[in-house]
Amino acid sequence: RERAGAVSGWATAGSFEASGSNGNSDKTDVSLSGLAQYLGDNFSNLIVFGSEYGESSGNKSADEQLLHLRHTRTLTVLTDWEYFYQWQQNDFIQLEERDLLGTGLRFKYGVNPNSGLYLGIGGFYESENRGVDGTSQIGRSNVYISYRKTNDKKITFVGTAYLQNKLDEFSDRRAVGGLSVSVPATDNFDFLISVDLEHDSRPPVGIEKTDWTYKTGIGWKF
């Protein structure tokens, strides 16, 4: 989600998605995400959270939480320095806990109120608890690209892709991507459509390498 405007100070944004069915199949899925961002002189602080829970025929089918903290400081007109911490949990890929601590540079191209292209290059330390598979601590590279475009009808398209390789074994890689479209309903509320992809080249036994997620919902920004 994009914050509302570029005025200094605090701003918030978020989204809510829900789906369900009853009858031949009983399914419920609810997800909530949000951000709070402070823009100061040549720096910003960002807090992001996300949570999803679902049930299918009385059995849990989704249970995932995420918290992301990021500090970004302007170095030049086209370059930022950023560092971040992230915590994540996802029962359905046998991920009891994942902690990331990283830093890197972000390069900006053609940034204006209606569009912007960002390229990030850096790395992070990762501590991951996979339950019966134990805990691992490794370093990963972190390369990402993000593009945002708002057209004349105020419809916003955002696409992001991350590639994260183990530093001493590049064949061990993780990829994360997402595409979202927001259509304004009012000045502060949008209709949302999103598609997300997560790929792990070496998942635990019994876990698929690639996950796709499709969602529709309502977003807000203030």
Regions found by a protein language model. Name each.
Residues A4-N22, N42-I47, F157:
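Transmembrane beta-strand segments of Gram-negative outer membrane beta-barrel proteins
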Residues G14-A18, L32-Y38, L69-R73, T103-F107, ...:
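Residues on the lipid-exposed face of transmembrane beta-strands in outer-membrane beta-barrel proteins
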Residues A18-N22, G40, S51-E55, W87-D91, ...:
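Transmembrane beta-strands of outer-membrane beta-barrel pores
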Residues D26-V30, S61-Q65, E97-L101, S115, ...:
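Residues that define the transmembrane beta-barrel architecture of outer-membrane proteins
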Residues K27-Q88:
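Glycine- and aromatic-enriched membrane insertion/assembly motifs of diderm outer-membrane
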Residues D41-I47, L78-W81, P113-L117, N151-F157, ...:
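Repeated loop/turn-to-beta-strand initiation elements of outer-membrane beta-barrel proteins
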Residues N114-N165:
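Detector for outer-membrane/organellar transmembrane beta-barrel domains
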Residues D168-F222:
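Predominantly the C-terminal beta-signal and adjacent terminal strand-loop region
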